Amino acid sequence: MNLTPEHAQKSSPMSWTVGGKTLNSRLLIGSALYPSPQAMQGAIEASGAEIVTVSLRRQSAGDQAGKTFWNMIKSLNCHVLPNTAGCHSAKEAITTAQMAREVFETNWIKLEVIGDQYNLQPDPFELLKATETLVNDGFEVFPYTTDDLVLAQRLVEAGCNILMPWGSPIGSGKGLMNPYNLNAIRQRFPELTLIVDAGIGKPSHAVQALEMGYNGILLNSAVALSPNPITMGKAFKSAVEAGVYAFDAGTMQERDLASPSTPVVGTPFWHQH
């Protein structure tokens, strides 16, 4: 392929801006559930992720293990995305977010307000309430939400520049259970930053979401619970790159019937039809 100057100057498809930061990895990764701190560090480095999610509860433990964990996170030179994991009300999430801003010195917050302990589904009412307050308080809210289009609209109206709909319940590894809904959100908000959060279990799930036009992937369990987290981190790095480049290139149109890929010119006449 001959690259014109226009093509040559085009920035890498991997480059994107989220929360005011320009990054070169579309993968956001969690810091929990790893078999050891060393496995966590190795897996995150292998994944190439530039954003790491952390829990205020983990950092606030105050013991030596908590300090070791935090020092290791800082050594990764990644942007920290604090979360409100474990919160079940807007009030609780708002308080946690405000504390996280002081501890981690960032206005980013991954907003989680869980409404059901059975499948860890977000509470849409409390999530929206917390979002409105935190946006007004100067936070860049990364809301963990469902794939409901109306809720997505309300969150955008509340001031969200980013949406993070789930692929499937947290930790389930079931991938994208409702591609139709996810695609509807993408089509409804073509310019918004969209990140699939939760349910990613395999690298192929990440590829599917990115081929759909989603901007990023947030995962934790898929890497942390792999028998080999470091190798799985590498696998997701490659998968995310494949998905982004595939979307940028554009995939072929599906056909109902076969279409020969080999031309018949020069084929012996007795093989031509």
UniProtKB/Swiss-Prot annotation:
Its EC number is 2.8.1.10. The active site is at K110. It is an enzyme of class 2 (transferase). One of its GO terms (biological process) is thiamine diphosphate biosynthetic process. Its main location: cytoplasm. It is found in: Cytoplasm. 1-deoxy-D-xylulose 5-phosphate binds at G171, A198, G199, N220, S221. Pathway: Cofactor biosynthesis; thiamine diphosphate biosynthesis. Pfam families: ThiG. GO terms for molecular function: thiazole synthase activity. Catalyzes the rearrangement of 1-deoxy-D-xylulose 5-phosphate (DXP) to produce the thiazole phosphate moiety of thiamine. Sulfur is provided by the thiocarboxylate moiety of the carrier protein ThiS. In vitro, sulfur can be provided by H(2)S. This is Thiazole synthase.
